[in-house]
Amino acid sequence: MDNQPPLPPVPPANPPVPPPAPTGPKTIYINYFDVITDAKVKVLMAVCSELLSQQKPDVLYFLFSSNGGNVNAGITLYNFLKALPLEIVMHNAGSIDSIATVIFMAGTKRYASKHSTFLFHGIASQFESKTTLDRNKFKEFLSALEQDENKIAGIIAGTTKLSQEEIRGLFLQGESKDLTFAMDKGVIQEIKDAAIPKGATIISLNLN
C-alpha cells in the first residue's frame, strides 16, 4: 500500500462580509445668536440655500437664541424654512423672544436647553422724530399692526397647543415663560441640552 502524503488542510471559506453599518441622516448644525433683521435673514437664507445645493444635508439643526426683531423678516424666514425639502430641528439655546418664537415654530422637532426661556409679547413700532400721522395714516398703521399680530398668533396656534385667545393674552402680558409651560403647551417636545457629535459640521452665524 502506497504511503500517500496527507492532504493539505482545506482553507476555511471566507467569512461573509458584514453589511456596512447604517449611517444616520446627514446633519449640519447652525448656531444663530443674534437679532432678526432684513439683512441677517437674507444672509441666513443664502447660507441655507448654499448648504442644500452643495452639501445636501438631510437635517438642519439650529442652536437658536434671539431677542427678536423685525416682524416681516421673521415671518419670511419662517416660511422659507418650512419650504425647505429637509428636516428642520430647532433647539432653544438661551432665550427665544418676540418674533423669534415664530421662527422657532419652523422646526419639525423643537427642543430647549435647561434654563432657557420663551418670551411672547405684542408688536411695538418706533416712529421717526417729528413723524406726522393723520387719521387715515393712523388707521393704516393700526391695521398693519393688527394683521401682523394675527399672523403671529395664527402660526403659533397652528404649531402648538396654544389657542389664539391664549396667545393674544400672552401678547398683552409680555411675560417670559419657563420650560414647564413650553412643554405643557407643545412649544417644545423635549427639554435637553444640545450635544453636537464630534466631527460634525457646524456653522456660526452670529453676525455683526
PLM region spans:
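N-terminal organellar transit peptides
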Residues: 1-208
